[in-house]
């Protein structure tokens, strides 16, 4: 029945749905997991890398995380070629604003500008929506550290912690459970990101080569965007595994004591 309504982007189904937009969202559901967490002293992006070929030159290739300007970065989930077009557009919008007003573009304004383009692709015939969701992290003088998410329909929102991609529902419920508002430091946010990725990624054991993490902080009045080196990610994973093992031991000891009673 739906085939009559899903061949074109602009046709509504009898239930008032745009199937092509929903199919674009479906493409994101199969992409690698990306999550963002807002902390008091910074904000981070963590993403699952799927293309981990050992011959890949990582100097020229970033699968998941892209720097947009001095104050913003983004992570993508979905069709990578679509993501490249959108990240280039984001950089152009940011540079035009800087040239015109001699100051960096506010985070939300950049997100809104891109979402207007995304929305246009759901409204005009002969085009298809971009099969990409983005997480944006940034800092501006108006609202400080910020985290935004946008989807193929052009819809966007500000978040304290969120996830897109594969197993995002499970990741969001974990974040909801473990996110402590007002108490999150970047250090605890990194530990939480590793914990969530460990539970939601479709791998038996989490490895540093499959994870990409970027942090955004402020130092001496300037924004610093850092992509964590593989060794740093390895240390975070190792620390998480040690804590998991410790918690498991304590649980067993507690159960044993209860049995002895």
UniProtKB/Swiss-Prot annotation:
PROSITE patterns for this protein: PROTEASOME_ALPHA_1 (PS00388), PROTEASOME_ALPHA_2 (PS51475)
Major site of localization recorded for this protein: cytoplasm
Annotated localization: Cytoplasm; Nucleus
Keyword annotations: Acetylation, Cytoplasm, Host-virus interaction, Nucleus, Phosphoprotein, Proteasome
Alphabetical list of CDD domains matching this protein: proteasome_alpha_type_4
Gene3D superfamilies (UniProt xref): Glutamine Phosphoribosylpyrophosphate, subunit 1, domain 1
Short name of one Pfam family: Proteasome_A_N
Protein name per the record: Proteasome subunit alpha type-4
Organism: Homo sapiens
């Amino acid at each position: 029945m739906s085939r009559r309504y899903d061949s074109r982007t602009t046709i509504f189904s009898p239930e008032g749905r745009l199937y092509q937009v929903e199919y674009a969202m479906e493409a994101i559901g199969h992409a690698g997991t990306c999550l963002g967490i807002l902390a008091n002293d910074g904000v981070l992006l963590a993403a699952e890398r799927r293309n981990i070929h050992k011959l890949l030159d990582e100097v020229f290739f970033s699968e998941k995380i892209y720097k947009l300007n001095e104050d913003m970065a983004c992570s993508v989930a979905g069709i990578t070629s679509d993501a490249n077009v959108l990240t280039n557009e984001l950089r152009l919008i940011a540079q035009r604003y800087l040239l015109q007003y001699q100051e960096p573009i506010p985070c939300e304004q950049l997100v809104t500008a891109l979402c207007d383009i995304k929305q246009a692709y759901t409204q005009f015939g002969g085009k298809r929506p971009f099969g990409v969701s983005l997480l944006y992290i940034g800092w501006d003088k108006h609202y400080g550290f910020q985290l935004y998410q946008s989807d193929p329909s052009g819809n966007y929102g500000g978040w304290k912690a969120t996830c897109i991609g594969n197993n995002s529902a499970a990741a969001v419920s974990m974040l909801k459970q473990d996110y402590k508002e007002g108490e999150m430091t970047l250090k605890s946010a990194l530990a939480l990101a590793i914990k969530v990725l460990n539970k939601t990624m479709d791998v038996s054991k989490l490895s540093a080569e499959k994870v990409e993490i970027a942090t955004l902080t402020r130092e001496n009045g300037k924004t610093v965007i850092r992509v964590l080196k593989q060794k740093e990610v390895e240390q975070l994973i190792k620390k998480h595994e040690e804590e998991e093992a410790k918690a498991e031991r304590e649980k067993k000891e507690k159960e044993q004591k209860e049995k002895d009673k």
